[in-house]
């Protein structure tokens, strides 16, 4: 048992990537952080850091679309959602789209470190722009962790990465739904995360409806047992891919609880983390 194969008694699953042997340097303003199994992620030391919301989006999408051969991650940032999905779907080919050059550069370093460059394409640009995604490009699984708030709805960070991850600078939940609907393969699945408060939930539902999507399942996420859900995970499919009788229903799953009342990690969330190659 050593630090390369284990972490606090937990055996790291999955393939061992080339890592730093691929001649990649960790710059002073960067960190290199463990994600799934032996995969790692380059992040800015003082920039946007991956979150529980990102982790859950990847888990939800790959759990309910486990046989995907092609996948698209919208607004992919530094690559958290896409990298975890790629770890869980080792045979799938990925396209990710991100508008910020600095985040794209970090994601490319991570893809190289993790040895997935041949099946993981990172495109720089606004996913709403017609030149970014061809009309004929279709994907079995599409994921998105969109910004939650319109500009002016809260205190805005001065850091470009943090600002774009929180506020709707380039599209909102409706744009994510519209793009997903255009690029889902027949029977494809779109997974995203968004606030669960009533007004925000209404935005998800309106965006899905306008795009011709059906929210086939959703799961509220409670960060502390006993509290109200702060975010929800949503799984959508195109209405045209479903029988008419099914299009008007959504299965609401039990709350996913992150921490118990005492502050310990909830047993189910520990199991979720194990499923995506994280220590419990």
Locations of regions flagged by a protein language model:
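Residue-level signal for inorganic ion chemistry
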Residues: 57, 145, 176, 236
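SAM-dependent Rossmann-like transferase core, predominantly class I methyltransferases
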Residues: 23-70, 76-87, 235, 248-251, ...
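Conserved Class I SAM-dependent methyltransferase catalytic core
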Residues: 169-225, 229
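Conserved SAM/SAH cofactor-binding pocket of Class I
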Residues: 59-144, 150-155
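General small-molecule cofactor/ligand-binding pocket signal
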Residues: 42, 95, 121-123, 216-219
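Mobile active-site "lid"/loop adjacent to the S-adenosyl-L-methionine
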Residues: 146-176
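SAM/dcSAM-binding transferase cores
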Residues: 228-280
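N-terminal auxiliary segments of SAM/dcSAM-dependent transferases
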Residues: 1-29
